[in-house]
């Protein structure tokens, strides 16, 4: 079916979201699919996020793409080259990113889980989580906060995954029952080797099935097609 626009009630308001299901891909032709929460990157909802959501869905999933900036109201799709070249717009963007603290990420994730659990076309009670940039952080945060509800969690060039802050995502992953995949960039100051090693150690000690990779020559944002650093 085409992209379906829905509204999700959260503690702080109403979050608009898109649902994607398989089209003509290998996952099509079924009545229900495993659910995946797709956490957007810092530039927010825009056509490339919809494209990525549909591509993931075509692998055989129902994909939920929520607008994590719903608390600030509607906004026009952001163009990376324009936003990053304008100091004022860049700072406004970073304010949005910083506004998503752990408490908000966790309460939102709980609402998204409840929403997926209510959908008849979603199969099973354990879901997947994936995200890019700040969405990678949100993906691991959600999985750590609800360890029994996620079968897998992925982060692509997610930042600040294993910092020394008390709300760092790695501190809450010890009870996770699912698998974790982290793809980082060697040239990414938000996920340096010290964080990679710290995350590796925590997941290994907890016995969590995981794989962490960092790609030489890649930069933060390498996996999103409309970013200048896409590779």
Model regions: which residues?
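N-terminal cap/leader regions of alpha/beta-hydrolase-fold enzymes
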Residues: 1-231
